[in-house]
């Protein structure tokens, strides 16, 4: 099972409201904040919406 380490690298301040809500729903707040989430379809779908704002690394358990 793998997890995803997601880091916000660009601010969501001037993004669309839906993208700002997605950033907040993933648990990201400020630039350079990082969360570790499970690798599943729901997470991947959310990441596709804000791919231009984040960096993603896979973490093997």
From Swiss-Prot:
Q: Please tell me whether the keyword Transmembrane is annotated for this protein.
A: no
Q: Name one GO biological process term.
A: translation
Record's keyword annotation contains Transcription: no
Q: Output the Pfam families linked to this UniProt entry.
A: Ribosomal_L30
CDD domains (UniProt xref)? Ribosomal_L30 (cd01658)
Taxonomy, superkingdom: Bacteria
Q: Name the UniProt key words of this record, in alphabetical order.
A: Ribonucleoprotein, Ribosomal protein
Per UniProt, subunit arrangement is: Part of the 50S ribosomal subunit.
Q: What is this protein called?
A: Large ribosomal subunit protein uL30
What gene is this protein translated from?
A: rpmD
């Amino acid at each position: 099972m793998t997890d995803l380490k997601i880091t916000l690298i660009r601010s969501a301040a001037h993004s669309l409201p839906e993208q700002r809500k997605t950033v907040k729903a993933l648990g990201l707040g400020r630039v350079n904040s990082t969360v570790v989430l499970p690798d599943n379809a729901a997470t991947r779908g959310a990441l596709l919406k804000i791919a231009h704002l984040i960096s993603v690394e896979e973490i093997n358990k």
